[in-house]
């Protein structure tokens, strides 16, 4: 039996399967995670400066150990971040909150901690993240408008413009310090934030 063409057939089948097979790509969140630091002792954070958000396996939201609806989370986060309850060097000059001594000192010291169960629905997890990012963006927009009243754009618009590859280098150089100044004030969400380099 002549088997000379068997290699050709096997090669053609291999080519056929390589061409017709689709390769699935993983989908997920595009987040920049902070690099590992060589700090041995963790920083001391006052309990009142931590805003804890927990999503359990039943998709129930607990904020500061109290049940809350997702649509109420943004306002609660803004209230916490903008409290400005610090005294002396911890005081916040730009905060417009209630200055409650039992809540955060200032946005630079405030930390939002998001924890979820493994069985939490992905869409609920994303909805909670979106509300927390929106709370930061509300405050960033307000502070950006206060510091740059003649610019005529919000922080989010300026950030989008800075990230756009079509934006000229001179415009990026102009936006960079303005964006960085606001970002420094509102950085301690446990979700990664944009770094302007």
Identify the residue ranges that each predicted region occupies.
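Generic intrinsically disordered, low-complexity segments enriched for polar/acidic and small residues
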Residues: 8, 13-14, 152, 159, ...
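Long, low-hydrophobicity, acidic/polar, solvent-exposed interaction domains
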Residues: 23-189
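Single conserved hydrophobic/aromatic residue that forms the stacking wall/gate
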Residues: 188-197
């Amino acid at each position: 039996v002549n088997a000379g063409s068997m290699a050709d057939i096997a090669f053609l089948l291999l080519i056929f399967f390589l061409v017709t097979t689709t390769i699935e790509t993983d989908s997920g969140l595009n987040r920049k995670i902070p690099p590992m630091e060589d700090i041995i002792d963790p920083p001391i954070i006052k309990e009142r400066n931590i805003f804890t958000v927990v999503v359990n396996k039943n998709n129930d939201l607990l904020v500061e150990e109290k049940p809350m609806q997702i649509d109420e989370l943004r306002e609660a986060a803004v209230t916490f971040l903008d409290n400005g309850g610090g005294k002396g060097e911890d005081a916040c000059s730009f905060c417009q909150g209630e200055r409650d001594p039992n809540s955060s000192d200032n946005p630079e010291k405030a930390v939002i901690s998001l924890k979820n169960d493994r069985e939490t629905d992905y869409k609920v997890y994303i909805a909670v993240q979106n509300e927390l990012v929106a709370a930061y963006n509300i405050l960033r927009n307000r502070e950006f408008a206060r510091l740059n009243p003649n610019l005529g754009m919000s922080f989010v618009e300026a950030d989008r413009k800075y990230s756009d590859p079509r934006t000229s280098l001179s415009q990026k150089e102009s936006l960079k310090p303005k964006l960085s100044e606001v970002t420094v004030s509102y950085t301690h969400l446990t979700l990664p934030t944009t770094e302007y380099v």
